């Protein structure tokens, strides 16, 4: 193995700024020149070149990262803190949310997860990954048609340079200010990508949780008719397991288009409670508190207290632990809620044992209640009025 010629590479990379990733020679690893290599970021500004095999080795060792090979300029537009975003101090749409919440049901989640986890794998660069993303798009469009919302609500694929596409559903509001609900649709077997990867919890559970919220939200005539103040989007990301590839591509485009994303909530792993219960602890949802937007995270706690039957616990997951990190890097307020405290989360992920039998659909339903409350409250929140000081926060 030979050392990469980092000085030659450096000449091809834009000069670093406070928002650009700085490529340091000391960060480069030993490479075989005949192998494709990828630039990953394991911490803010800390990068190294790796092969795909080395990516999976790092993941097996518990190292999370962003693959920034094609997204080195993510965050370069200077959107971060360009303007202060104020979030509500309390929930004000209880009647509407609780009425819509009656439509939330574990049966559709179970049926959808059975289908999603039946694909041999949802590895993003496989034919199975393509087929599973086709199914996600088909299912979302089916929900739109069943709700009679196809004149206003749309769903489309977001293509990538790999096989699996992301899916974006859009519910137009009165303004272009946007609330994003996200989950990643891909799965991975970290021992070898071609091996079976049912991915029931990671992140089949999040995928079907936000599907169910989307289905329930379309029961609102006000939402379907575009009466929400803000536009609402549901994202099902491709290639999260490869280094947040799909979400980075989307938020890179949004950043370049100067899209006004007011809030992004990620749901990644929503179904496993055994670790919590076995530890003698009460069932709860885990609110991530590192590498997230503090104000948005505080609001999420308020939403959980208002709309969930179980409490929240604070927990940490490290840098780039899910797709909210892509939104955050682009300068958008983002947050992440997981099934439990991080140390009590599902030990079966990334293996053939990530199966439905280990999951609680009642727990997933709590995540759905939280997500529905979150998206409805913020969908109808007047951010402009709040900034002016005329609205109640």
From Swiss-Prot:
<dbReference type="GO" id="GO:0046872">
    <property type="term" value="F:metal ion binding"/>
</dbReference>
<comment type="subunit">
    <text>Monomer.</text>
</comment>
<feature type="binding site">
    <location>
        <position position="202"/>
    </location>
    <ligand>
        <name>Zn(2+) 1</name>
    </ligand>
</feature>
<keyword id="KW-0732">Signal</keyword>
<dbReference type="InterPro" id="IPR045175">
    <property type="entry name" value="M28_fam"/>
</dbReference>
<feature type="binding site">
    <location>
        <position position="241"/>
    </location>
    <ligand>
        <name>Zn(2+) 2</name>
    </ligand>
</feature>
<feature type="glycosylation site" description="N-linked (GlcNAc...) asparagine">
    <location>
        <position position="176"/>
    </location>
</feature>
<keyword id="KW-0865">Zymogen</keyword>
<dbReference type="GO" id="GO:0008235">
    <property type="term" value="F:metalloexopeptidase activity"/>
</dbReference>
<dbReference type="GO" id="GO:0004177">
    <property type="term" value="F:aminopeptidase activity"/>
</dbReference>
<keyword id="KW-0645">Protease</keyword>
<keyword id="KW-0378">Hydrolase</keyword>
<dbReference type="InterPro" id="IPR018247">
    <property type="entry name" value="EF_Hand_1_Ca_BS"/>
</dbReference>
<feature type="binding site">
    <location>
        <position position="350"/>
    </location>
    <ligand>
        <name>Zn(2+) 2</name>
    </ligand>
</feature>
<feature type="signal peptide">
    <location>
        <begin position="1"/>
        <end position="18"/>
    </location>
</feature>
<dbReference type="GO" id="GO:0006508">
    <property type="term" value="P:proteolysis"/>
</dbReference>
<keyword id="KW-0964">Secreted</keyword>
<feature type="binding site">
    <location>
        <position position="202"/>
    </location>
    <ligand>
        <name>Zn(2+) 2</name>
    </ligand>
</feature>
<keyword id="KW-0031">Aminopeptidase</keyword>
<comment type="similarity">
    <text>Belongs to the peptidase M28 family. M28E subfamily.</text>
</comment>
<feature type="propeptide">
    <location>
        <begin position="19"/>
        <end position="84"/>
    </location>
</feature>
<comment type="function">
    <text>Extracellular aminopeptidase that allows assimilation of proteinaceous substrates.</text>
</comment>
<keyword id="KW-0862">Zinc</keyword>
<keyword id="KW-0325">Glycoprotein</keyword>
<dbReference type="GO" id="GO:0005576">
    <property type="term" value="C:extracellular region"/>
</dbReference>
<feature type="binding site">
    <location>
        <position position="268"/>
    </location>
    <ligand>
        <name>Zn(2+) 1</name>
    </ligand>
</feature>
<keyword id="KW-1015">Disulfide bond</keyword>
<protein>
    <recommendedName>
        <fullName>Leucine aminopeptidase 1</fullName>
        <ecNumber>3.4.11.-</ecNumber>
    </recommendedName>
</protein>
<keyword id="KW-0479">Metal-binding</keyword>
<feature type="disulfide bond">
    <location>
        <begin position="317"/>
        <end position="321"/>
    </location>
</feature>
<dbReference type="Pfam" id="PF04389">
    <property type="entry name" value="Peptidase_M28"/>
</dbReference>
<feature type="binding site">
    <location>
        <position position="184"/>
    </location>
    <ligand>
        <name>Zn(2+) 1</name>
    </ligand>
</feature>
<dbReference type="InterPro" id="IPR007484">
    <property type="entry name" value="Peptidase_M28"/>
</dbReference>
């Amino acid at each position: 193995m030979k050392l990469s010629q980092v000085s030659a590479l450096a000449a091809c990379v834009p000069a670093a700024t406070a928002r650009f990733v700085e490529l340091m020679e000391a960060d480069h690893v030993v490479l075989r020149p005949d192998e494709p290599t990828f630039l990953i970021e394991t911490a803010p500004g800390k990068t190294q070149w790796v092969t795909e095999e080395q990516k999976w080795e790092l993941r097996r060792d518990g190292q999370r990262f962003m693959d920034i090979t094609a997204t080195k300029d993510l965050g370069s537009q200077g959107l971060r803190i360009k303007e202060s975003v104020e979030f509500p101090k309390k929930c004000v749409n209880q009647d509407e949310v609780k009425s819509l919440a009656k439509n939330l049901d574990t049966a559709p989640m179970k049926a959808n997860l059975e289908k999603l986890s039946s694909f041999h794998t949802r590895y993003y660069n496989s034919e199975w990954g393509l087929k599973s993303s086709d199914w996600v798009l088909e299912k979302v469009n089916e929900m739109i048609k069943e709700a009679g919302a196809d004149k206003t609500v749309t769903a489309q694929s977001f293509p990538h340079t790999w096989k699996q596409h992301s899916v974006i559903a859009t519910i137009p509001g009165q303004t272009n200010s946007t609330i994003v609900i996200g989950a990643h649709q891909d799965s991975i077997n970290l021992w070898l990508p071609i091996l079976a990867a049912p991915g029931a919890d990671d992140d089949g559970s999040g995928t079907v949780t936000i599907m169910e919220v989307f289905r329930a939200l379309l029961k609102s005539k006000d939402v379907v008719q575009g009466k929400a103040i803000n536009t609402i989007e549901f994202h099902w990301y491709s290639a999260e397991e490869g280094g947040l590839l799909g979400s980075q591509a989307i938020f890179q485009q949004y950043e370049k288009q100067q899209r006004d994303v007011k809030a992004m909530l990620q749901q990644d792993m929503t179904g496993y409670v055994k670790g919590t219960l076995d530890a003698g602890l009460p069932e709860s949802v885990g609110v991530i508190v590192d590498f997230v937007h503090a104000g948005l995270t505080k609001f999420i706690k308020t939403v959980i207290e208002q709309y969930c039957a179980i409490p929240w616990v604070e927990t940490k997951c490290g840098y780039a632990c899910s797709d909210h990190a892509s939104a955050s890097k682009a300068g958008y307020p983002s947050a992440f809620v997981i099934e439990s405290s991080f140390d009590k989360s599902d030990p079966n992920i990334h293996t053939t044992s990530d199966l439905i039998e280990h999951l609680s659909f009642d727990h997933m339903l709590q995540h759905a209640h939280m997500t529905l409350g979150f998206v409805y409250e913020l969908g109808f929140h007047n951010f402009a009025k709040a900034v002016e000081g005329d609205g109640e926060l």
